[in-house]
Design a protein with these regions (language model features):
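Eukaryotic partner-binding/assembly regions in large regulatory complexes
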Residues: 1-8
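Charged low-complexity intrinsically disordered patches
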Residues: 105-129
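Winged helix-turn-helix DNA-binding recognition segment
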Residues: 3, 14-19, 37-102
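N-terminal cationic-hydrophobic initiation segments that often serve targeting/anchoring roles
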Residues: 33, 85, 123-126
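Short helix-coil-helix linker/hinge
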Residues: 22-25
Length: 129
């Protein structure tokens, strides 16, 4: 999970969830996208081996707070997760220590595709302007 990037489409600005979020909730929203696994990863969850799929991750409220910053409280994070569930952005399954978060429709928005390079394609000439 340490490397890579995520896609954030401009259409997000028109999304009702985004429009109804506070600045703090938007920080949490983007942070959750950044925390999600981009490929399968093995975890132990509720005492059992679990394979986290792309768009899922195991975390805690405290861990989210460490990533978003101390200015955002655990209560704000908890309320944001509840709001994100109502808007069907994510699902959150918690135990007394950890929480499995699944970003809904992850594959639809974050599917791997060819990454553009600075190199010209074979059917296009390079120019020196």
């Amino acid at each position: 999970m340490a490397g890579g990037w995520i896609k954030v489409h401009r259409k997000l600005l028109e999304n009702s969830l985004w429009e109804n979020c506070t600045a703090e909730q938007k920080v949490i929203f983007i942070t959750l996208l950044l925390m999600a696994n981009h490929e399968e990863k093995e975890w132990i969850f509720k005492g059992e081996k679990y394979i986290c799929k792309p768009g899922q991750f195991v975390t805690s409220l405290k861990s989210i707070q460490e990533k978003v910053g101390k200015d955002i409280s655990i209560m704000q994070i908890r309320r944001s997760l509840e709001k994100f569930e109502v808007y069907q952005f994510l699902t959150s399954e918690s135990t007394n220590k950890n929480r499995l978060i699944t970003i809904e429709n992850w594959g639809l928005y974050q599917e791997k595709e060819d990454v553009p390079t600075d190199k010209p394609t074979s059917n296009r000439q390079a120019t020196d302007n």
